[in-house]
Amino acid sequence: MFKGIVEGIGIIEKIDIYTDLDKYAIRFPENMLNGIKKESSIMFNGCFLTVTSVNSNIVWFDIFEKEARKLDTFREYKVGDRVNLGTFPKFGAASGGHILSARISCVASIIEIIENEDYQQMWIQIPENFTEFLIDKDYIAVDGISLTIDTIKNNQFFISLPLKIAQNTNMKWRKKGDKVNVELSNKINANQCW
């Protein structure tokens, strides 16, 4: 379980594509390197991954399952992209946010971004077959960020992220049309990334 709070922003340094797996090299921020080692559990844009190796500040992950690559946003990533990172909370630590399984329910599309002095707001559209799982004022996670659904319209939902928080996540670089990972408040989890 993860906290739904972004602890740092990683940068994709390298992607190696193979027949049965993809290998991702992520440059980690200095504040997250302490304690990161092989087999550490990491939240990567809302998806649970296991570290395969660490070389200085470069952390490697393997994405094995073809279905995982098909269902989440891994197929969208390119070198230079920024990703949200989080770690498994230590026993007894305050969680904040809401507890996430880091199992992606579906991939959604950003259809509108509205920014003002205090908030970054978005309309996000999920696949129609997940509409029934949207609950007004319920928790939802977008790329691993714990949020509350403000409004629902058909298969779209509206969220407001305080600007000071948005500036410390990959949402700072998001634009209309981008794909994001969504976890639907533990009501349904269709996929797990390893």
Curated annotation (Swiss-Prot):
Gene name as annotated: luxY
Source taxon at top rank: Bacteria
Keywords (alphabetical) are: Flavoprotein, FMN, Luminescence, Repeat
Q: Which PANTHER family match?
A: RIBOFLAVIN SYNTHASE, RIBOFLAVIN SYNTHASE ALPHA CHAIN
The cofactor required is: FMN
Alphabetical list of SUPFAM superfamilies matching this protein: Riboflavin synthase domain-like
Give the protein's recorded name: Yellow fluorescent protein
The record's cofactor note says:
Binds 1 FMN non-covalently.
Listed Pfam families: Lum_binding (PF00677)
UniProt keyword annotation of Ribonucleoprotein present: no
User: Which PROSITE patterns does the annotation name?
Assistant: LUMAZINE_BIND (PS51177)
The record's listing under InterPro entries reads: ATP_synth_asu-like_sf, Lumazine-bd, Lumazine-bd_dom, Riboflavin_synthase-like_b-brl
